[in-house]
Regions:
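Short, amphipathic, aromatic/basic-enriched membrane-interface segments that mark the entry/exit
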Residues: 1-4, 49, 65-75, 92-97, ...
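Divalent metal-coordination and catalytic microenvironments
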Residues: 1, 52, 256
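C-terminal membrane-associated helical module and adjoining short loops/tails
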Residues: 130, 136-289
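Alpha-helical transmembrane segments
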Residues: 40-44, 116, 218-221, 275
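Multi-pass membrane catalytic core of lipid/isoprenoid biosynthesis enzymes
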Residues: 35-37, 53-108, 126, 148-156, ...
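Membrane-embedded alpha-helical segments that form the functional core of polytopic membrane enzymes
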Residues: 9-51, 57, 83-91, 95-111, ...
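Membrane-interface helix-loop-helix junctions at boundaries between adjacent transmembrane segments
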Residues: 110, 114-122
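Acidic (Asp/Glu-rich) catalytic motifs at the cytosolic membrane interface
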Residues: 36-74, 165-178, 282, 286-287
Length: 289
């Protein structure tokens, strides 16, 4: 299980929740959605390893299941418990959260069990990320339409980014094809372009320094693309994995930027960006790809 990346999922919840609440009130609902997201995200990681155990035995034999440290049955039970905990936490928040969580379960299992090795695999992973951000926004009354902008547009752009990331990372354990990587780069930048377009044109509820925000986003985008180009020029597994790790870390920063733009509250943005600390720290001992 690539535990460090669970904090990237939590950054989705922070952004989504603030888009519909402007603060962390009510704190119980916010906390339960963090638990729901973490449970569902980690369950997806576990089931991914369960269904990928034969491939991992060849490409990643040190992982817990192929190495024999954890049995397939034990891993499946753990994945089921995490998934139930995630759905249960969402159900406690409310009906809309339960609906989004159930959609997310379907997307997770659809990816892990059926679609991962097909051309629809990256699409489904993007849908998972889209739904995770919408889960953060879902703590609203049932009569309120959840599926509206700005959360719908932001979630779509972030989902497109993750779709491209997944495409880019599909062959990370072995030599990747340049054409494959270039395709991933194009989708990644389509998602990033959607975010930049929204930053520049959306009627944000509070006054912001657009130049500063676009400059911050530009730094993140340039950092991502530098690693992408390096991996394309030399598509060795190590370079592709570094690019993927850079994108996962940058994802948190993109969410932090959107948090600041929506709330103009630097504290909320710093809290979001602070999720980088456990991500980076744990990645020294645990895999992120």
């Amino acid at each position: 299980m690539r535990f460090p990346t669970v904090f990237t999922a939590m950054s989705d919840i922070i952004l989504g929740f603030l888009l519909t609440h402007n603060s962390f009130e009510p704190p119980l609902a916010f906390g339960l959605l963090l638990v729901a997201s973490a449970g569902l995200y980690l369950s997806g990681m576990v089931f991914n390893d369960v269904f990928d155990r034969k491939v991992d035995a060849q490409e990643r034999p040190s992982r817990p299941i192929p190495s024999g440290r954890i049995s397939t049955q034990s891993a499946a039970v753990l994945g089921g418990m995490l998934m139930l905990a995630g759905v249960g936490a969402a159900q406690t928040v409310g009906r809309q959260s339960l609906i989004v969580a159930c959609l997310l379960v379907g997307a997770i299992l659809g990816y892990d069990v059926i679609l991962k090795k097909t051309f629809l695999g990256p699409v489904m992973m993007g849908i998972c990320r889209f739904l995770n951000l919408m889960l953060g926004a879902s703590a609203v009354a049932r009569e309120i339409n959840l599926w509206v902008k700005p959360q719908l547009r932001i979630a779509a752009a972030m989902g497109l980014f993750i779709m491209g990331l997944t495409w880019f990372a599909r062959m990370e354990a072995k030599q990747s094809h340049r054409g494959h990587l270039i395709g991933g780069l194009l989708v990644i930048n389509a998602g990033l372009g959607g975010l930049v377009w929204m930053l520049a044109t959306y009627p944000w509820p509070r006054e912001i320094n657009l130049t500063m925000v676009l400059a911050a986003a530009g730094v993140v985008i340039l950092t991502i693309n530098r690693r992408l180009v390096q991996a394309i020029l030399n598509p060795a597994p190590q370079n592709v994995q570094i690019a993927v790790k850079t994108m996962l870390i940058s994802y948190v920063m993109l969410n932090a930027i959107m948090v600041f733009v929506w709330t103009t509250n630097p504290t909320y943005a710093i809290i979001t960006a602070a999720l980088l600390l456990p991500t980076i720290l744990l990645s020294r001992w645990m895999a992120v790809t």
